[in-house]
UniProtKB/Swiss-Prot annotation:
Organism: Mesocricetus auratus (Golden hamster)
Keywords for this protein: Acetylation, Angiogenesis, Cytoplasm, Developmental protein, Differentiation, Growth factor, Heparin-binding, Mitogen, Nucleus, Phosphoprotein, Secreted
Maturation propeptide residues: 2-15
Lineage: Eukaryota, Metazoa, Chordata, Craniata, Vertebrata
GO cellular component, one term: cell cortex
Descriptive protein name: Fibroblast growth factor 1
Gene: FGF1
Length: 155
């Protein structure tokens, strides 16, 4: 290889015949603020619970493209979404309100910013009591927006 040449590699999904973004196992999103797991309930309510055995905390993260993810409750089949007021809810179908920008922070936690409201920097967040924090009330540096993706235990 001559100096200055660039070698490119085919996408791993093509090379290993993996489905794009849907090969991950379900995860739990543990919030640094109050120790709650993000939960999507059958009625579309989004909140947090400390009950690790709750089936509604199992979430499937699937990549739309690099750094962009859909978050779907495996039990309810609903997608995490943020409306125009910054409220989190469960949506039956994926739409532009369901797409989030996933970012790995220096402290190894992840943050999820609404792609639709990216210019406003609205994050997914949970208060210490487990209720949702509205997008306009979130900002970088808060513990409420820090989530640690954990594997679902096989107990």
């Amino acid at each position: 290889m001559a100096e200055g040449e660039i070698t490119t590699f085919s996408a791993l999904t093509e090379r290993f015949n993996l489905p794009p973004g849907n090969y991950k196992k379900p995860k739990l999103l543990y919030c640094s603020n109050g120790g709650h797991f993000l939960r999507i309930l059958p009625d579309g309510t989004v909140d947090g619970t400390r009950d690790r055995s709750d089936q509604h905390i199992q979430l499937q993260l699937s990549a739309e493209s690099a750094g962009e993810v859909y978050i779907k409750g495996t039990e309810t089949g609903q997608y995490l979404a943020m409306d125009t007021d910054g409220l989190l809810y469960g949506s039956q179908t994926p739409n532009e309100e369901c797409l989030f920008l996933e970012r790995l922070e220096e402290n190894h936690y992840n943050t999820y910013t609404s792609k639709k409201h990216a210019e406003k920097n609205w994050f997914v967040g949970l208060k210490k009591n487990g209720s949702c924090k509205r997008g306009p009330r979130t900002h970088y540096g808060q513990k409420a927006i820090l989530f640690l993706p954990l594997p679902v235990s096989s107990d």
